[in-house]
Amino acid sequence: MAVGKNKRLSKGKKGLKKKVVDPFTRKDWFDIKAPSTFENRNVGKTLINRSTGLKNAADGLKGRVVEVSLADLQGSEDHSYRKIKLRVDEVQGKNLLTNFHGLDFTSDKLRSLVRKWQSLVEANVTVKTSDDYVLRVFAIAFTKRQANQIKKTTYAQSSKLREVRKKMIEIMQREVSNVTLAQLTSKLIPEVIGREIEKSTQTIFPLQNVHIRKVKLLKQPKFDLGALLALHGEGSTEEKGKKVNAGFKDVVLESV
């Protein structure tokens, strides 16, 4: 007798849909905290898979880089064309403590600065801060009309541009090498270095729209938890940092 399939038997349904599990149920949300250099310390939230077995969520969070508009950090639309990069260095509970990782301009702002009838001056320098962070700083500037000038164009001679560029590099090296990374951030917010360059180059050739357009972190020293906690107000729960005034001045200690 031949043995075959019994068509009367009910068949099991093929391709049964598996129970869909929402992937977000396996993830945790963490709050990103900016250093107290910025006025608004609440940057936003990020998520990661929960710690399971040998996999620790903190290891996956450390080193993450987030890009935030400086307008959000300072609560002012005047800074909307600048972007700040923050790097997660430490995890404390549900809070991620970050440090400054870089600065950049938005592309639309850079394009709006470039115009006809003027010369563009760019300079960059690699310099080490007093707390051993190696940075590459990029500056941009444009020539402007001299006093009582009738001529429409403001082009500068190559020799003048070389002098201006040399002065820009000299100022950037001086302003960055004598301060810590936190102090440099306080200088970048009100654009102290740009104003110093504009003031110092008046005798060579008048400039306008002088900006530090980019700061790139090349190398950082060994991680120091104490320094990071001090940068964040030693783990304080305050959600607001100290506002940086436009007339920023270095603090000089009279006595130690």
UniProtKB/Swiss-Prot annotation:
<dbReference type="InterPro" id="IPR027500">
    <property type="entry name" value="Ribosomal_eS1_euk"/>
</dbReference>
<dbReference type="InterPro" id="IPR001593">
    <property type="entry name" value="Ribosomal_eS1"/>
</dbReference>
<dbReference type="GO" id="GO:0003735">
    <property type="term" value="F:structural constituent of ribosome"/>
</dbReference>
<protein>
    <recommendedName>
        <fullName>Small ribosomal subunit protein eS1B</fullName>
    </recommendedName>
</protein>
<keyword id="KW-0963">Cytoplasm</keyword>
<dbReference type="InterPro" id="IPR018281">
    <property type="entry name" value="Ribosomal_eS1_CS"/>
</dbReference>
<keyword id="KW-0689">Ribosomal protein</keyword>
<feature type="modified residue" description="N-acetylalanine; partial">
    <location>
        <position position="2"/>
    </location>
</feature>
<comment type="subunit">
    <text>Component of the small ribosomal subunit. Mature ribosomes consist of a small (40S) and a large (60S) subunit. The 40S subunit contains about 33 different proteins and 1 molecule of RNA (18S). The 60S subunit contains about 49 different proteins and 3 molecules of RNA (25S, 5.8S and 5S).</text>
</comment>
<dbReference type="Pfam" id="PF01015">
    <property type="entry name" value="Ribosomal_S3Ae"/>
</dbReference>
<dbReference type="GO" id="GO:0006412">
    <property type="term" value="P:translation"/>
</dbReference>
<dbReference type="GO" id="GO:0022627">
    <property type="term" value="C:cytosolic small ribosomal subunit"/>
</dbReference>
<comment type="similarity">
    <text>Belongs to the eukaryotic ribosomal protein eS1 family.</text>
</comment>
<keyword id="KW-0687">Ribonucleoprotein</keyword>
<keyword id="KW-0007">Acetylation</keyword>
